[in-house]
A protein has these predicted regions:
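C-terminal ends and interior cores of transmembrane alpha-helices
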Residues: 90-110, 308-327
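Intracellular juxtamembrane helix-capping segments at the cytosolic ends
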Residues: 127-142, 347-360
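Cytoplasmic membrane-interface "Motif A"-like loop-to-helix N-cap segments
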Residues: 77-93, 295-309
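Helix-loop boundary and gating motifs at the non-cytosolic
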Residues: 2-68, 72, 158, 235-275
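Helix-to-loop junctions at the C-terminal end of transmembrane segments
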Residues: 68-81, 173, 284-298, 390-391
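Flexible cytoplasmic inter-helical loops of multi-pass small-molecule transporters
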Residues: 206-225
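Transmembrane alpha-helix termini and helix-breaking/packing motifs in multi-pass membrane transporters
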Residues: 41-46, 73-77, 100-107, 162-182, ...
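Loop-to-transmembrane helix entry/capping segments in MFS-fold secondary transporters
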Residues: 51-52, 142-153, 268-269, 362-372
C-alpha cells in the first residue's frame, strides 16, 4: 500500500488510520506487559542474585529508549512520517528473537542473561526512534477532537490486553513442563509474535504528505535551539521540572514485585497477577483520562495522576508493617498498590504529551516532544539507586525516596494553567 497519497485533506483517512493504530497499540501494549519490569526484575534476581543488576537493566532500557527521541526531532520537516516509524518498528521488534533463541538453544545461564540484556537494549533503542514520528503521524492523521478518544481508547484496550497477559504470565510461570529460564523465554516468544503481528497493521496505514515542508534544517541546529526554547517558555520549564520530579517514582516501582515476593511472602508464580492489577488500573482510568484530554483539562489530569501515584507509594510504605501485624485488609494492599500505579502511569503519559501538543506548532512540536521524552534519561539512573538502597537498607526508605519528589511535582502542577488555548 503506497504511503504517497496526493490528497489535500490530511484527515482524509482518519477513520482507517484510527482503527489500524488502535489495533497495533492494543497488541503492542499487550505484548510489552509480558516483559514488564516487575517480571524481568524477578527473572534477573533469580538468575544472578543481584538487585543492583536488576536496577542497571531497567536503567539501560529507559536510557536507550529516550535518547533516540532527541535524535528524531527533525521529522517535523519531513513530508511523510509513516515510512520512518514503520522501518524502525520492524527492526526493533525482530530484536526480541535474540533472547528467544538464546533461551532455548543455549545451556549457559550467563549467556541467556546476556541475551536478555541485548534484546531489551536493542528493542527499546530502535523503538525510541519511532516515538516522535509516530506522534507526529497521529497529530496529522487524527482530528484534534478525536485525539483524546484515540489515546484513551488505546490505553483502555491495551490495558484489557495486558490484563489477559497477566493471566497468561501466571499460567506460563507455573507450567510444570516449563522450567527456569525457559518459562521466561516463552514469555518473550509470545511477546515477539504479538509485536510482529502489529507490524502488519502498520503497513496498511495511509498518509497524505505535509505541505510546505522544509527538510534542509540540520539536526545539530535544532539541538542547539533547544536551550533557547526552554529559556523563553516558562510553561515548558515548569512542565519539565514536574515531569522530572514525578519520574522519581521509578526509584521504587521497578521493585514492587520483588518487594512482594521477598518481603511479604508472595509466591513468585503469582507475579502475573500484579500485571492484572496494574492493567486494571490503566483500563478503569483510561475513560476519565480520555474525557479530560478531550476537554483540554491537562492540569487536572496531571494532578490526578500525581495523587494516585502518591497513594500507591504510601500503600507500599505501610504494606510491610501491615503484613507483619496481620492487619485486617492487609491482603488488599498489593492489588490496590499496583492498581493505582497503573492508573497513574498512563495518565502522566497523556497529560504531558497533550500539553506539548497544545503549546507548540508543527515545527516546534517534534522538538519539544523529543526534548521532553529525552529528559527521562536524567532519571533513568534511579532504578540503579533503588537497587542499591534495597541491597543495604529497608524498603521503607526506598519508598520515601520516591514519595518526597512526587509531592514536589504536585505542588508545581498547581501553578500550571488549567486549560490550553
Amino acid at each position: 500500500m503506497s504511503t504517497d497519497d496526493p490528497v489535500d485533506d490530511p484527515y482524509a483517512y482518519w477513520k482507517r488510520n484510527f482503527l489500524l493504530l488502535i489495533l497495533d497499540s492494543t497488541v503492542f501494549m499487550t505484548a510489552v506487559s509480558l516483559s514488564d519490569v516487575s517480571i524481568l526484575s524477578v527473572f534477573l534476581v533469580k538468575a544472578t542474585g543481584s538487585t543492583f543488576l536488576a536496577g542497571v537493566f531497567q536503567m539501560v532500557r529507559v536510557t536507550v529508549f529516550f535518547i533516540p527521541q532527541l535524535l528524531s526531532i527533525n521529522v517535523g520537516g519531513k513530508p511523510y512520517k509513516k515510512r520512518i516509524f514503520v522501518k524502525w518498528t520492524m527492526v526493533g521488534r525482530c530484536c526480541l528473537l535474540i533472547a528467544v533463541l538464546a533461551t532455548f538453544l543455549a545451556r549457559d545461564l550467563h549467556l541467556i542473561v546476556l541475551s536478555f540484556f541485548l534484546s531489551f537494549a536493542l528493542f527499546p533503542l530502535f523503538d525510541g526512534f519511532t516515538v516522535v514520528p509516530w506522534l507526529e503521524y497521529v497529530v496529522k492523521s487524527i482530528p484534534p477532537p478525536k485525539r483524546g478518544t484515540f489515546f484513551g481508547l488505546s490505553q483502555g484496550l491495551g490495558a484489557a490486553g495486558m490484563i489477559a497477559s497477566g493471566f497468561l504470565i501466571t499460567l506460563i510461570l507455573n507450567a510444570p513442563h516449563l522450567i527456569f529460564p525457559q518459562n521466561y523465554g516463552t514469555l518473550v516468544l509470545v511477546e515477539a509474535i504479538l509485536m510482529l503481528t502489529g507490524v502488519g497493521f502498520l503497513l496498511y496505514l495511509r498518509e497524505a504528505p505535509d505541505a510546505a515542508t522544509t527538510d534542509d534544517t540540520r539536526l545539530l541546529d535544532l539541538l542547539k535551539g533547544i536551550p533557547r526554547i526552554i529559556r523563553e517558555d516558562e510553561m515548558v520549564r515548569r512542565l519539565i521540572l514536574i515531569q522530572l520530579l514525578f519520574s522519581c517514582y521509578s526509584v521504587s516501582t521497578p521493585f514492587y514485585a520483588l518487594f512482594a515476593v521477598t518481603q511479604l511472602g508472595v509466591n513468585e508464580g503469582q507475579v502475573g497477577f500484579f500485571i492484572v492489577y496494574q492493567m486494571a488500573g490503566r483500563l478503569v482510568a483510561s475513560f476519565p483520562w480520555a474525557h479530560l484530554c478531550n476537554k483540554g483539562h491537562n492540569k487536572q489530569l496531571l494532578q490526578s495522576t500525581g495523587l494516585l501515584m502518591l497513594a500507591s507509594l504510601l500503600l507500599a510504605l505501610v504494606a510491610g508493617a501491615s503484613y507483619a501485624a496481620d492487619a485486617p485488609g492487609a491482603s488488599l494492599l498489593i492489588p490496590l498498590m499496583f492498581f493505582l500505579y497503573g492508573a497513574a502511569f498512563s495518565g502522566m503519559f497523556l497529560a504531558v504529551n497533550n500539553y506539548v501538543l497544545g503549546i507548540s506548532d508543527r515545527q516546534q512540536r517534534p522538538i519539544l516532544l523529543g526534548t521532553m521524552n529525552a529528559l527521562y534519561v536524567v532519571t533513568s539512573i534511579l532504578p540503579v539507586l533503588g537497587g542499591i538502597i534495597i541491597a543495604y537498607l529497608p524498603y521503607e526508605l526506598l519508598f520515601v525516596t520516591s514519595i518526597v519528589p512526587v509531592v514536589g511535582s504536585l505542588l508545581l502542577a498547581s501553578r500550571l494553567r488549567q486549560t490550553l488555548d
